[in-house]
Swiss-Prot record:
Keywords: Transferase. This is 4'-phosphopantetheinyl transferase AcpT. The keyword Transferase applies. InterPro entries: 4-PPantetheinyl_Trfase_dom, 4-PPantetheinyl_Trfase_dom_sf, P-Pant_transferase_sf. GO terms for cellular component: cytosol.
Amino acid sequence: MYQVVLGKVSTLSAGQLPDALIAQAPQGVRRASWLAGRVLLSRALSPLPEMVYGEQGKPAFSAGAPLWFNLSHSGDTIALLLSDEGEVGCDIEVIRPRDNWRSLANAVFSLGEHAEMEAERPEQQLAAFWRIWTRKEAIVKQRGGSAWQIVSVDSTLPSALSVSQCQLDTLSLAVCTPTPFTLTPQTITKAL
């Protein structure tokens, strides 16, 4: 089973959480998205299992919970991918101009990924950049890696993992799962 839930950071970060969990929230710019992610998790699972953190900081449920999850946010949107199949990764990005997006693609995309982007019409290449970027990030996050490892991922190569993605208006969303899953707008739940 896979469950994908999208929500708004600005709304969810004010949601109800136990005081002990709120006390764990980081201060500064990450606080609102951290709280929003925990609210999404607590709405999906009650009670919320105890969490631990991997070497690269990836949150996970403690050993007793046979569930896996991953969170991602961009702008005011947050995504939760929940699984009972194994480790998962997700990435969401607002499709937006970025000053150095072509240079970044040259630096981190494989030849196959670069060819995929260049095959698009010029007006579609920015969306293709974000499509490839989210796919790479989802793979790295499924592995529990850090953003610095994105350059070592070639998302065009065959893999035992399943990667699926879709575009929702101005959002690019990708998921990486251990078993086949097709991400479509119909498979996504919107949090209130």
